[in-house]
Amino acid sequence: AKVLSSSINHGGKTNGYTVPNPVAQGALISETLRKAKVPAESISYVEAHGTGTALGDPIEISGLVRGFKYNVTEICPIGSVKSNIGHLEAASGIAALIKVVLMLKNKKLVPSIHSETLNENLNLSETPFYIQHKYEDWIPTYKLTEGRKTYYPRRAGISSFGAGGSNSHVIIEEYSEQPEVDIKFDSEHEFAFVFSAENKEYLYKYLNKTLIWINKQLKDTYNEETIVL
């Protein structure tokens, strides 16, 4: 998987030490999307912090709605690994990341178990989100251009929040293999190699050793070694 962007912020002053700030959470998500340079509608799964608390979860949903600014007609599954393995405290963020990376690798959405009975204050019917309750193929979102569907890569947003108001959000994307490009070199072209060293003395020594190696090994042929350099 590829990390497209990540951001952190803090909720600032709230009604209590453990009370989240939906405005700060929404601003964080918007900033992470901006840094990733991807549209909100391209996110086809959200891994929520989702501690299962009566107050925190509705506030997080409010922050997600603020951050993604979806139309209500757009649907995006959400889940939380905490419903499956519990709250790992300091390791909860990396657990969420590992979960989503494995989902991207296998192109599957996995259920958040023990979540059949939802907090009534979530009001998910008034949002573009729904809880992922079953194991199924991960279908990416798409955009319509002159009636034609163009699918986005599978992308996910991952939230992880601290008890004292610290917030983090990461956007990751599935890895797509790129076709290998056969690069051919010849002696008629010039190529620029970049070298660095601690100081000029070491730089000149390094350049001299490299030049000797090139003359011995490459002769007049440019090959894979040239690409490495």
Indicate where each model-derived feature is located.
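Condensing-enzyme catalytic core of the thiolase-fold
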Residues: 1-186, 191, 202, 207, ...
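Short hydrophobic/aromatic beta-strand micro-patches
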Residues: 196
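Charge-dense polyanion-binding interfaces
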Residues: 219-229
